[in-house]
Amino acid sequence: MAKKKAFTPLLYLASIVFLPWWISLSFNKSLKSWITNWWDTRQSETFLNDIQEKSILEQFIEVEELFLLDEMIKEYPETHLQKLRIGIQKETIQLIKLHNEDHIHTILHFSTNLICFVILSGYSILGNEELLILNSWVQEFLYNLSDTIKAFSILLLTDLCIGFHSPHGWELMIGSIYKDFGFAHNDQIISGLVSTFPVILDTIFKYWIFRYLNRVSPSLVVIYHSMND
């Protein structure tokens, strides 16, 4: 009975680790056809206007072509102009297809991650007893560590998260999450998050030391400040 009671939280922990992967794999396949059909039937007209105004001009017309376009039209015979129009039309259709696929990919990943979050939230609520057992194990493990090891672990964690070299790690992590949700890479948004998120974490961590650790384990705070200095 005791073994079964100890095995259940471990099984629950393993299911939490692998459940997001299974949800993503399952819903990606089931939602892709529905989202593709919805996008093709309801969004194609609006999207085409957007492509005509922005992406097509940006990708198909170079600065030099803007100056030479009139000369090309005057000098080329009608057959060459016809081939040119056909080629541009084919490339335009291909570009629209690629952009449609990018938008479908974004909607699909965002929907899948939202569903995954809802399911995991419900799963966590239903498994509240297992979470309490896992929490007690973690607290017992941390309680048995010496203050020196605790201070070293806190110092290592803070240096990784909010230290001098942490922005590079945050940039990779936020970029990966941003990509996982299906959004296109945006340097301005990622740079903004990288510059603000560690500062917020640093403030929260200092408040935690001031309010919690000073009350629970003053010796740990002394060791931490000694190692940090």
Curated annotation (Swiss-Prot):
It comes from the Eukaryota. It is found in: Plastid, Chloroplast inner membrane. One of its GO terms (cellular component) is chloroplast inner membrane. Contributes to K(+)/H(+) antiport activity by supporting proton efflux to control proton extrusion and homeostasis in chloroplasts in a light-dependent manner to modulate photosynthesis. Prevents excessive induction of non-photochemical quenching (NPQ) under continuous-light conditions. Indirectly promotes efficient inorganic carbon uptake into chloroplasts. GO terms for biological process: potassium ion transport. It holds the Pfam family CemA. The keyword Transport applies. The chain crosses the membrane at residues 7-27, 114-134, 154-174, 189-209. GO terms for molecular function: antiporter activity; proton transmembrane transporter activity. The gene is cemA. This is Potassium/proton antiporter CemA.
